[in-house]
Amino acid sequence: EQNSEQPTSSSSTSSIFAYRNFDFVPGDKIIFFYDMSGEQDAEIPARMLINDGNAEIQTFKGEKVLYIPANASVSMIPDIDKDSYLPEQFTLEFDVLSNEEYNGLPVIELYFRAPEHKNLSWSHTGKFYVQLAGFGTEQGTSAFQVMNESSIYGGSPVQFPQAAVNTAKDNWRRFSLYVNKNIGKVYIDQHRLNIVNRIEPGAGVLTMEIRTAEHPMLIKNIRIAAGGSDAYKRLITEGKIISYGIQFDVNKADLKPESMGAINEMFNLLNEHSDLKVEIGGHTDATGSAEVNEKLSAARAEAVKAQLVKMGIAESRLATKGYGSSQPIADNATPEGKTKNRRVEFKKIN
């Protein structure tokens, strides 16, 4: 398959070992995924609606990215044809790059609002709000603030922990957000930055607001997904768990470090239920030849098995199979469909 999710640059902290305690697991029902690969440079992004400001598509080191110029700002929303698309339990992920020396900017502000406020810009109206400023610099901060329509309370900005500081140039950072009813968690790479437990219900839409200073900001791999129920409950009632959190390098079977959230979840499940046996199934989208996709998916399933065995799960409890593109669960004609089809499934076996 030609994976439309773009690779992230490796860093000294980006290793399977560094992510060994990572607990973020993406939602299992894709709502939105922005594949920019077919777009033209200097054009307005096709799948982000700009309420105010400036953003465009550019090529950076051979891949298409959402580009916010230096000394600019933009307020934008995902182009999703629903008045309200955020459920009570959901995840948001994207990769961000900025070489700015932090001095109040750059900043990303994420507003989660009631549907009737989806077109607001530069307003503190909403249900809750997440802010990232400075990213990996020594002065980087993050905040998760609960809002009461027009006022913000709680969740003052906190400085990045020292372990999350990474000042390397051209360094992609992975942002992750988990929301489940009144609980919210914010991550940068493998580090959890914030947690709150007083979110009020009613947020249905997302607004992204970004401001830059002397350097541009780049964003890619924007993904929104609805969260699933308890993993063991899904396995018993549905017979399988569909995982989108297990990620691989493009056209390879090498696990990305951020896969450890989903792998840790599966390890804990198998560790707690010692009689459980599963088949690990690799699945691809329909891009490329069926033979290549089948081999790739089989190798990826084996890579997941190898990691679980390394962590202490008996090999006899784990079977593997590569299905390639033979079992699609969505239409391969859309970015979201392709993303849904690129998955790892854990099936209960006797």
Feature locations, PLM:
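Short carbohydrate-recognition loop motifs
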Residues: 53-75
